[in-house]
Amino acid sequence: MSGQTLTDRIAAAQYSVTGSAVARAVCKATTHEVMGPKKKHLDYLIQATNETNVNIPQMADTLFERATNSSWVVVFKALVTTHHLMVHGNERFIQYLASRNTLFNLSNFLDKSGSHGYDMSTFIRRYSRYLNEKAFSYRQMAFDFARVKKGADGVMRTMAPEKLLKSMPILQGQIDALLEFDVHPNELTNGVINAAFMLLFKDLIKLFACYNDGVINLLEKFFEMKKGQCKDALEIYKRFLTRMTRVSEFLKVAEQVGIDKGDIPDLTQAPSSLMETLEQHLNTLEGKKPGNNEGSGAPSPLSKSSPATTVTSPNSTPAKTIDTSPPVDLFATASAAVPVSTSKPSSDLLDLQPDFSSGGAAAAAAPAPPPPAGGATAWGDLLGEDSLAALSSVPSEAQISDPFAPEPTPPTTTAEIATASASASTTTTVTAVTAEVDLFGDAFAASPGEAPAASEGAAAPATPTPVAAALDACSGNDPFAPSEGSAEAAPELDLFAMKPPETSVPVVTPTASTAPPVPATAPSPAPAVAAAAAATTAATAAATTTTTTSAATATTAPPALDIFGDLFESTPEVAAAPKPDAAPSIDLFSTDAFSSPPQGASPVPESSLTADLLSVDAFAAPSPATTASPAKVDSSGVIDLFGDAFGSSASEPQPASQAASSSSASADLLAGFGGSFMAPSPSPVTPAQNNLLQPNFEAAFGTTPSTSSSSSFDPSVFDGLGDLLMPTMAPAGQPAPVSMVPPSPAMAASKALGSDLDSSLASLVGNLGISGTTTKKGDLQWNAGEKKLTGGANWQPKVAPATWSAGVPPSAPLQGAVPPTSSVPPVAGAPSVGQPGAGFGMPPAGTGMPMMPQQPVMFAQPMMRPPFGAAAVPGTQLSPSPTPASQSPKKPPAKDPLADLNIKDFL
């Protein structure tokens, strides 16, 4: 191990001490040794990805951390290790990477330690961009091109033309990113870059096989396609030919480096006559179209998708006017790579609509909302028809649709709702489609020029604006543009800039169906779109008010956004009004935060959606909004699942108090257990924390149980006095409510509901005796209490209990220590003893608390302990060891004044 540096050994030793074997293996695989990662470490990590109890996010975070090292060797090896796991590891690993907002932000990486560092830094930047692109394409396609079946019955060979036209540009983008590695044989001078080159070489062969299958599929169906599709297919084929040359050059390098020729495929180009034939066919289609501008062109495409829609000729006339905007060809833009869509948008536009309609939008025209969802259900639809193409196509489409704007505006507002209108069927289809498209379009393209995102986020869920939204999302940001999505993007632009900028206040359904939610007010939409938006604004305003949190029920439907899984099934919920469940925890990656319906409660807290990168619920969450108070502070806490990777908690616009408490609690949870417990504000919501501490896989894949709504209690509301009582609230959701301090029925009710902070507050005040209800007792006790408080126990006891309860410290020892006191209802007696126990709420909390947090608490205890001792016996009682009986007698003398108050009240 001579190549290892001292820092390598120290890092490995640190992880060994903390018991993280996976993190240790990552460190071992990414040492400063100038050689590729060792097979034994890679094999260990691959095996780890297949274990159900391994924390994939933690593994990925450790790799990202190593990739921030200043040494090119460590960074390069971290990239190689990540690539190896993406290729050979369990698919959960690449799924998680695809769900992240950012991966490798190494676009500016430079190791100035030596000339070798300069050279290697160049390849590190290119390599990281390819890995980002690989994860991004997985996010859009929901499968890895390198893993899917190839050949005559492979995925690309059997894919429908519409989907194929959308997926080919994505595949092209991934191949381009790989070819940009552009290494020469004389630059493969060390084991690290050699290891990377081998992985790239193997990837290229698999990707090119898919590419070839896709082109074959296109050519087989070329003569059956509509004009717009033919144009796109021809453009894809031309690009294929140019890439073929570059691929052959890459393979030559592999051959020179010594890779067995048997492993290198021979590429033979098709005869040039094929290209001529394809162009002639396209020209014939073009020739027919001018003669009968809409007649032949539009009907044929329409007829293909749904003959009945040929009636849409009236729409076609507006389309003609649209012709002026040539580049709009939906499919062309869909190919993203192909701006050629010079074909007259008019027919293309119509063609587009029918295509989508066939996909499910047009068919759904009558039952609009549900059908689009149904259509979308096929992942292909998401990929091929709407979402993928939407990125680029929607924007253009939006402009085109402008001509329709006057007519569609009403339909658009009702787009998904009333697409049924036959006359506007095509136009509405477009809008509905765009909405669906936006599903992925905005979500992924959404590096929505941060500014537009804010507008999009706007709560107004104007359905029509989806087009604008998509437009915004894609405006200037071509999802396929080489720069976009690369590590180079700023953190906000993150590779998948899917999350709306945190700034967007609109909690509504910003991400899921960002496009639909786009408020008409969004300034970003193209002027044309703006007009449409303006027209629709009135209607949308009404709709928005009705669906406020439901976020335009239709819009929420797209939440099926989960890229991986139900992701494609945008459940018909779209039509459904605010289904709280809307694609609830479909999200493979949704953390509890996403799956827990309570979040939706208050639209404001919902903003946490930014945190939920992929969580469908983030979008759907608003629908559950029916439960007002649940806006659990925890949502952010849950998010911590990924270690605050998304840092959403901070940005969430939850009520200030809630946000603060929740964010601190959750962040602290994962940040450092000890520290978090000390934090006074951490919300006591234990359920969420339990989830946080779980292996995370459940949470990661949406299986985690939604945190109990009862936990929604917001500790921050109770400030000073509440600190003592707060613990009782924490256990509220937990099984042993009996031990709760507040015996009053009102209190119990508030606990159970956990939804009405005001009522719970009032009940707490009543218990304290501050309210008029117990004026006599309260006043007397309060005065006496104050005297004691001044005694000096004042500051200690108060603070300690608060931190304990908030920190979820109820450790098992504490339980044992106070069992009699707390287990018995404080009212029962044990005046002083019972009160402190209840006040701290330790036992109850302990019962419900996750075991994991408890241990950390134990570590924190010593720190809390001295203050307790100083304060008086009560502190000692808190310590785990003392026996409850002996402690209780001692307590009375120094018992907390507040505790005394409560007991008397109960008596």
UniProtKB/Swiss-Prot annotation:
Heme in keyword set: no
InterPro entries xref list: ANTH_dom, ANTH_dom_sf, AP180-like, ENTH, ENTH_VHS
Low complexity bias (residue ranges): 505-515
Ranges of compositional bias, category Pro residues: 516-525
Residues modified to Asymmetric dimethylarginine: R865
Glycosylated residues in this chain: T310
Every ENTH domain range: 14-145
Single Gene Ontology MF annotation: phosphatidylinositol-4,5-bisphosphate binding
Keywords, in A-Z order: Cell membrane, Coated pit, Glycoprotein, Membrane, Methylation, Phosphoprotein, Protein transport, Transport
Localization annotation: Cell membrane; Membrane, Coated pit
Composition bias type Polar residues, residue spans: 302-324
Compositional bias ranges of the Basic and acidic residues kind: 893-907
Major location category of this protein: membrane
Omega-N-methylarginine PTM sites in chain numbering: R865
Sites bearing Phosphothreonine, chain numbering: T317
Annotated signal sequence range: none
Record PTM text: Thr-310 can be modified by the addition of N-acetylglucosamine which can be further phosphorylated. There is no evidence for direct Thr-310 phosphorylation.
Segments of this protein annotated with the region Disordered: 285-326, 342-380, 393-414, 505-525, 867-907
Family of the protein in this entry: Belongs to the PICALM/SNAP91 family.
Quaternary structure (record): Binds AP2A2. Interacts with AP2B1; clathrin competes with SNAP91.
Function: Adaptins are components of the adapter complexes which link clathrin to receptors in coated vesicles. Clathrin-associated protein complexes are believed to interact with the cytoplasmic tails of membrane proteins, leading to their selection and concentration. Binding of AP180 to clathrin triskelia induces their assembly into 60-70 nm coats.
Protein name stated in the entry: Clathrin coat assembly protein AP180
